[in-house]
C-alpha cells in the first residue's frame, strides 16, 4: 500500500505533464495528442504543476526491503526509477534545444519536477543491496520488460526484435548470476526467489484507474514521513 501511494502521487503529476505537453503539441504543431496515445489515456488536467514543488526532504521515501518485498514490487520500483531518470535527463539536456521559448520554459519547469520524482522513486530501492545484487536485479528487470513486449506484441516483425533482445538480456542475466556467485558466494535465487515472472505488463486502457486516482487524491501532497496527505491538513 505504501508503494502504491508513492506511485499514485507522481502519477497525477505526470498526468498533468502529459496534458501540458499535449497543449503545446496542438498549439505549435496542430497535432492532437489523443491520436498518439491510442485513446488508451484521457488527456486532461491532473495535479497542477505549481502545486508539485516540494521541499527536497519531502521527496525522500522509505526504502523497500529486498528480502521481504514481492518480486513485482522490486520490479516496479526499478522500472519507474529508470524511466523517470531517462525522462529527467531528456527534459534537462535536450529540452534546452527546443525551437520555441515557450517549449524550452515548459521543459525546464517540468524537468525540476522529474528530478523530484527520481529522488522519490530511487529512495524506494533497498540501499542495503550490493552492487552485484543490483546488477542481477537490473538484468532481471530488463528480461521482464522484453518478455512483456514479446507476449503483448501483435506485429510479428516487431515481435522478433523483442525476442532477440530478450535472449540477449537472458545471457546478461546469466553473466550477472555468475559474478554474484563468484565474488559474493550467493545464489541468484536469494535475490530472485521465483523463476517465474510476475504478471506481465500489458498495453491497454487505464482510464477508469486514472479517474479513480484523480477523484480520490487530486488534492494530496507529500511530506517527509507521508507519501500522500491532503493539502488542507498541512
Q: Predicted regions: what is each one?
A:
Residues 1-234:
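Non-heme di-metal
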Amino acid at each position: 500500500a505504501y508503494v502504491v501511494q508513492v506511485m499514485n502521487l507522481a502519477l497525477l503529476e505526470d498526468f498533468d505533464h502529459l496534458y501540458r505537453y499535449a497543449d503545446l503539441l496542438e498549439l505549435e504543431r496542430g497535432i492532437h495528442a489523443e491520436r498518439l496515445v491510442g485513446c488508451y489515456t484521457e488527456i486532461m488536467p491532473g495535479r497542477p504543476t505549481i502545486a508539485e514543488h516540494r521541499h527536497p526532504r519531502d521527496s525522500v521515501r522509505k526504502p523497500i526491503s529486498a528480502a521481504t518485498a514481492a518480486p513485482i514490487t522490486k520490479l516496479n520500483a526499478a522500472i519507474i526509477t529508470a524511466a523517470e531518470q531517462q525522462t529527467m535527463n531528456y527534459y534537462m539536456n535536450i529540452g534546452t534545444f527546443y525551437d520555441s521559448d515557450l517549449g524550452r520554459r515548459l521543459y525546464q519547469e517540468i524537468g525540476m519536477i522529474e528530478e523530484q520524482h527520481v529522488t522519490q522513486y530511487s529512495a524506494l530501492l533497498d540501499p542495503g543491496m550490493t552492487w552485484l545484487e543490483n546488477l542481477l536485479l537490473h538484468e532481471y528487470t530488463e528480461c521482464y520488460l522484453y518478455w512483456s513486449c514479446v507476449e503483448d506484441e501483435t506485429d510479428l516483425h516487431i515481435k522478433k526484435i523483442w525476442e532477440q533482445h530478450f535472449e540477449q538480456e537472458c545471457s546478461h542475466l546469466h553473466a550477472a548470476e555468475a559474478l554474484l556467485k563468484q565474488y559474493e558466494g550467493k545464489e541468484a535465487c536469494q535475490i530472485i526467489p521465483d523463476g517465474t515472472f510476475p504478471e506481465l505488463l500489458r498495453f491497454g486502457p487505464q482510464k477508469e484507474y486514472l479517474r479513480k486516482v484523480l477523484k480520490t487524491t487530486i488534492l494530496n501532497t507529500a511530506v517527509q514521513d507521508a507519501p500522500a496527505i491532503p493539502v488542507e491538513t498541512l
